[in-house]
Amino acid sequence: MTEQTVTLQTTVGDITLELYYNHAPKACKNFYELSKRGYYDNTIFHRLIKDFMIQGGDPLGNGRGGESIYGKKFEDEITKELKHTGAGILSMANSGVNSNGSQFFITFGPTPWLDGKHTIFGRVKSGMKVVQKMNAMQTNNDKPIDEIRIIKATAN
């Protein structure tokens, strides 16, 4: 399979994400297809915790919404090879075991306590300066004060 990426055009700048199909095929297919369908277009990053992560992918914008392409929550794809070792890791947000939908997060630094709990399915290929800029933004109750929006998600 040729490398597939997704570019998030955000109000802060562009981030291109490389997807790890060999390690997490279901999560990658879900993210890629949702991006292709315009599912993430005009959604916000609803959660930002400095030096931890930024979370998006919820069409409701409050952390409670989102569906997968599979019509329901899908199972985790945890591998021992992939760990949350630094900034720029792309991982599925969930509410417990096997509860993946459409929400995802990008790490701002090492988050080893998430290993074995969240499916890693990619990394930032380009746009780390944009991710760093997001990390520096002010928040109120873990929500960015100045809204960070995905204008368009493009499946490449």
UniProtKB/Swiss-Prot annotation:
Domain of life: Eukaryota
UniProtKB keywords: Cytoplasm, Isomerase, Nucleus, Rotamase
Cellular localisation: Cytoplasm; Nucleus
Major location category of this protein: cytoplasm
Reactions that this protein is recorded to catalyse: [protein]-peptidylproline (omega=180) = [protein]-peptidylproline (omega=0)
One Pfam family in the UniProt entry: Pro_isomerase
Single GO term (MF): peptidyl-prolyl cis-trans isomerase activity
Similarity comment: Belongs to the cyclophilin-type PPIase family.
Primary enzyme class: isomerase
Gene Ontology annotations of biological process type: mRNA splicing, via spliceosome; protein folding
InterPro entries given in the database record: Cyclophilin-like_dom_sf (IPR029000), Cyclophilin-type_PPIase (IPR024936), Cyclophilin-type_PPIase_CS (IPR020892), Cyclophilin-type_PPIase_dom (IPR002130), Cyclophilin_A-like (IPR044666)
The protein's Enzyme Commission number: 5.2.1.8
Keyword Isomerase: yes
Gene Ontology cellular-component annotations: catalytic step 2 spliceosome; cytosol; nucleus
Name of the protein described by the UniProt record: Peptidyl-prolyl cis-trans isomerase cypE
PPIase cyclophilin-type domain location: 2-155
Alphabetized PROSITE patterns for the sequence: CSA_PPIASE_1, CSA_PPIASE_2
Chain's role: Catalyzes the cis-trans isomerization of proline imidic peptide bonds in oligopeptides. Plays a role in protein folding, transport and assembly.
